[in-house]
Design a protein with these regions (language model features):
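Long, charge-rich alpha-helical interaction segments
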Residues: 330, 334-342
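Basic, Lys/Arg-rich alpha-helical nucleic-acid-recognition elements, primarily the DNA-binding modules
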Residues: 1-89
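Short N-terminal signal/transit or membrane-insertion segments
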Residues: 3, 98-126, 184-214, 342
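Short, charged low-complexity intrinsically disordered segments located at boundaries
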Residues: 44-49, 77-78, 92-98, 134-140, ...
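Helix-turn-helix/homeodomain-like alpha-helical modules used for DNA recognition
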Residues: 80-158
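Charged, low-complexity, helix/coiled-coil-prone segments
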Residues: 2-12, 40-47, 134-141, 155-172
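Hydrophobic protein-protein interaction segments
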Residues: 145-330
Length: 342
């Protein structure tokens, strides 16, 4: 392939990705006008770039990549080798908690904007999106992140209290949970998925970083969340803690139980004809790639896991009851341990 043909191929792929992400929400004319304004060129010149009659410069590629949140390196003919390019945050010490939350919000917003999307979440623990809709649970998870994972110095000598987390963070967390409520999602859990939160709560109490009453209150809220998720699995539709059904797709919640495979919080996202994989890295972060061969491979793997799992949403009332009875039993056992602890 000549350099010129390769550049045409890459440029077409970039604009196709932008169009796929926009879906029906942006007309071709609107995209041309947006591109013309971004590159400071005429609409005719923008059309010529879209039709690949004029090549993009490196400066224009950078502007388009930043503005439309697309990565052009994934389109550079990677199929000719076995290499996969992953995007990974290496400057984590300079990443603020605001940036961390906004990154989750932005990625999720881009995914659900497309009418043809789906998320497959192979859950090592209960997906964080669920926690964020209950303020007390969101506050604890955020405190845990900032103290234990981000290791923020100002949290070194603090014990957990519900009022330590700012309203700004809780409000953004709520928005993230509302976005996820609109997503067409497939979650793969196992019996270990619920243990993580219980273990974190007990550890904080045993380490003197949380009062007993607070730990028990958190477990009560966790039971409340599990009751909500059980209801969602029953109706296969995400709903808020108050029972209101948000905007979204009917049958947009699919829950699977796999008793053998230990998951790792890997996420596969399909957005129209494009896809993205999120691979866990450094405890809290994700490496991402949109490499088609890799994404197709992961999609096939996760599809295979779901086929070998028990679907506990929808009509599977017996299996659903067995699983959630186990969950509530583990929560009560933890509360009993806390109640008699010194």
């Amino acid at each position: 392939m000549t350099i010129e043909n390769k550049q045409v191929k890459v440029q077409k792929a970039i604009f196709n990705e932008i169009k796929n992400r926009a879906g029906n929400k942006k007309s071709s004319r609107a995209l041309v006008e947006e591109l013309a304004q971004l590159l400071n060129v005429s609409t005719d010149s923008a059309y010529r770039r879209l039709r690949c009659e004029k090549f993009l410069t490196l400066d224009e590629l950078e502007k388009i990549s930043m503005h439309f949140k697309v990565s052009f390196d994934k389109h550079l003919a990677l199929s000719e080798s076995d290499s996969v390019i992953f995007k990974v945050a290496l400057n984590q010490q300079n990443t603020s908690f605001d940036d961390f939350l906004m990154g989750i919000y932005t990625d999720l917003e881009k995914i659900i904007q497309h009418p043809n999307h789906k998320l497959i979440y192979s859950a090592k623990e209960v997906p964080i999106f669920h926690f964020l809709q209950i303020p007390e649970l969101a506050a604890f998870k955020m405190f845990y992140w900032m103290k234990t994972l981000f290791q923020m110095p100002e949290y070194n000598n603090l014990s957990f209290s519900f009022d330590f987390i700012s309203e700004k963070y809780l409000a953004l967390g709520k928005k993230i949970s509302e976005l996820y409520a609109q997503a067409n999602s497939y979650e793969i859990w196992n019996f270990e998925s619920v243990h993580s939160f219980i273990a974190q709560t007990e550890f904080y109490f045993q380490s003197g970083m949380m009062y007993k009453q607070t730990a028990i209150a958190l477990l009560d809220k966790f039971a409340e969340l599990m009751t909500l998720i059980k209801k969602q699995a029953d109706i296969e539709f995400k709903c808020s803690i108050k029972g209101a059904v948000p905007k979204g797709h009917p049958k947009n919640y699919h829950l699977y139980l796999n008793e053998i495979i230990l998951s790792d919080n890997t996420i596969y996202a399909q957005v129209g004809e494009s896809s993205m994989c999120y691979i866990p890295h450094a405890l809290l972060y994700y490496m991402t790639t949109a490499d088609k061969a890799y994404c197709d491979h992961l999609h096939n793997v996760l599809d295979g896991v779901m086929r070998k799992s028990t679907k506990i949403s929808g009509t599977a009332e017996k299996h659903r009851s067995i699983f959630f009875n186990y969950v509530f039993q583990k929560i009560e056992e933890a509360k009993n341990r806390l109640a008699i602890a010194l």
